[in-house]
A protein has these predicted regions:
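Alpha-helical transmembrane segments of polytopic integral membrane proteins
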Residues: 42, 134-137
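A generic structural micro-feature
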Residues: 120-126, 144-148
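Alpha-helical assembly-interface signal, strongest on the long, hydrophobic N-terminal helix that forms
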Residues: 2-89, 93
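Short secondary-structure junctions
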Residues: 91-102
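Outer-membrane beta-barrel architecture
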Residues: 104, 125-127, 151
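A short hydrophobic beta-strand element
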Residues: 124-134
Length: 163
């Protein structure tokens, strides 16, 4: 009889220990999941900024219906350059739902030069910035840190300009 009572006591103890440890383990697991999602989001916006900067560097415009960066042609109308770069970068980050409004494009002169970059000239630096707001899916982590603003900028020299 004493063995049965000891066994029940041990079973109850294990249940209490499990009840105390389980929420911590779940929180840790969800934190790891959110951390992985944050790394994925940052890598995606970094790739999008790079893709947009490459299109800006060669002064090309996307020709595929989806607006991605794989098929390009020279820009006949330079006023389309910003549109093409923004569309390319936003399309590269489709998985995050990034729109063209989250992409900023600017052209600056290299330091120590008198090069004018309005309109764009060869040698100007194309700056493409992609912004994203990351929302953790774990409620307790979301309450502690809130939303996390992410931004990635890619800078490349303009290699060619078409008339």
């Amino acid at each position: 009889m004493k063995q049965l009572a000891d066994r029940r006591r041990r079973d109850g103890q294990a249940l209490v220990e499990f009840a105390l440890v389980f929420p911590v383990l779940i929180l840790l697991l969800l934190g790891i999941l959110d951390f992985g999602r944050a790394i994925y989001a940052y890598n995606t916006i970094a790739d999008a900024a790079r893709d947009g900067a490459r299109v800006a560097a060669v002064n090309q415009i996307a020709t595929s219906p989806a607006g991605d960066c794989t098929q390009t042609r020279p820009i006949e109308d330079p006023s389309n350059a910003h549109w093409s770069v923004k569309t390319c970068a936003a399309t590269s980050a489709t998985a995050l739902g990034i729109q063209t409004g989250a992409v900023t494009v600017s052209y600056t002169a290299p330091p120590g030069t008198t090069l004018t970059c309005t309109p764009v000239n060869v040698g100007c630096i194309a700056n493409v910035t992609v912004d994203y707001v990351f929302n953790p899916i774990t409620p307790i982590i979301g309450n502690i840190v809130g939303t996390i603003g992410m931004s990635s900028t890619s800078k490349v020299p303009v290699e060619r300009v078409f008339p």
